Amino acid sequence: MGDWSALGKLLDKVQAYSTAGGKVWLSVLFIFRILLLGTAVESAWGDEQSAFRCNTQQPGCENVCYDKSFPISHVRFWVLQIIFVSVPTLLYLAHVFYVMRKEEKLNKKEEELKVAQTDGVNVDMHLKQIEIKKFKYGIEEHGKVKMRGGLLRTYIISILFKSIFEVAFLLIQWYIYGFSLSAVYTCKRDPCPHQVDCFLSRPTEKTIFIIFMLVVSLVSLALNIIELFYVFFKGVKDRVKGKSDPYHATSGALSPAKDCGSQKYAYFNGCSSPTAPLSPMSPPGYKLVTGDRNNSSCRNYNKQASEQNWANYSAEQNRMGQAGSTISNSHAQPFDFPDDNQNSKKLAAGHELQPLAIVDQRPSSRASSRASSRPRPDDLEI
């Protein structure tokens, strides 16, 4: 029974990827089945055939009667039961190793993409696809594997097959032996000359072990059923809470489109002002310096307000009768982006700009012209 160490090492790796019920099931399998089968049970059935005696001298009669009473030894039957029950768990472990291998490949690919990203290559979509694949395989940070998706289905299938094998071996044992051993077996089979009685060694001790292994099988079956219901209801609960696939919830949440035509967006997001229209009376080469915010996506920012301001300015210049050449260099100051509320108030008022000087354009009267032509005492003589 020294070969049990290899199976024990494999099953021990399943502990890290099992639920609480699965860990208890593995403990029951190790302690009450493998260890007990490798120590006490094997020694109890060690003299099984050698101590089987029949009240006849006919050669070969004891062998055929033993074969009829015990088609398969209890020890070998329980070994087969442990192997069959452990196979679904080993298949689940193989799936876990497959997922871990996938994780290594995805991590390697992710590192290569991050190196390419540092060189200026746009790999955001590829990195997003890798994250989705990791979630699909149940891979979390720090190499931890979470039970979801295909891994969860494999785990549920393994529990189902373990339960089926437990029930099948219990039925086979009941059909072949029953759950107790008799001290005397009656045999009538060739080449026995007549019906003979055969005697079994330590029947009570063997019956105790049979009942004990029966109880362990029932406990294992109950743990499988409990774990199956636990995994099922936990999956339903996660789906109700929306935790089963958070990528579906976040993938549809697209960022809102930016309205570059909005005045508030242009002001608060650094949109550059359009080039303001020059006044009709502006001299050649005159240019109004505007604020540059390094963003050409919002060139229609505050266009109507700029045109209205320049129209008001031109009307004031025409009314005042001033030439465009009198524009001082003080107009070439950086264009300010006022607040929307202040800008609207100025547009509503329409008379924010005041004339620099008031000139009376009416013609002078005759009296005033004559009075102005008379010499005054304080006039300077040339």
Curated annotation (Swiss-Prot):
One of its GO terms (biological process) is cell communication by electrical coupling. Changing residue 364 to P: In heart malformations; shows abnormalities in the regulation of cell-cell communication as compared with cells expressing normal GJA1. Changing residue 76 to H: In HSS; overlapping features with oculodentodigital dysplasia. Residues 2-23, 98-155, 229-382 are cytoplasmic. The modification Phosphoserine is found at residues 5, 255, 262, 306, 314, 325, 328, 330, 344, 365, 368-369, 373. Residues 264-382 are annotated as: Interaction with UBQLN4. The modification Phosphotyrosine is found at residue 247. SUPFAM superfamilies: Connexin43 (SSF118220). The modification Phosphothreonine is found at residues 275, 326. Residues 362-374 have a biased composition (Low complexity). Residues 317-332 have a biased composition (Polar residues). Disulfide bonds join 54-192, 187-198. It is found in: Cell membrane; Cell junction, Gap junction; Endoplasmic reticulum. Signal peptide: none annotated. There is a cross-link at residues 144, 237 (Glycyl lysine isopeptide (Lys-Gly) (interchain with G-Cter in SUMO)). Its main location: membrane. It is a multi-pass membrane protein. A connexon is composed of a hexamer of connexins. Interacts (via C-terminus) with TJP1. Interacts (via C-terminus) with SRC (via SH3 domain). Interacts (not ubiquitinated) with UBQLN4 (via UBA domain). Interacts with SGSM3 and CNST. Interacts with RIC1/CIP150. Interacts with CSNK1D. Interacts with NOV. Interacts with TMEM65. Interacts with ANK3/ANKG and PKP2. Belongs to the connexin family. Alpha-type (group II) subfamily. This is Gap junction alpha-1 protein. It comes from Homo sapiens. The gene is GJA1.
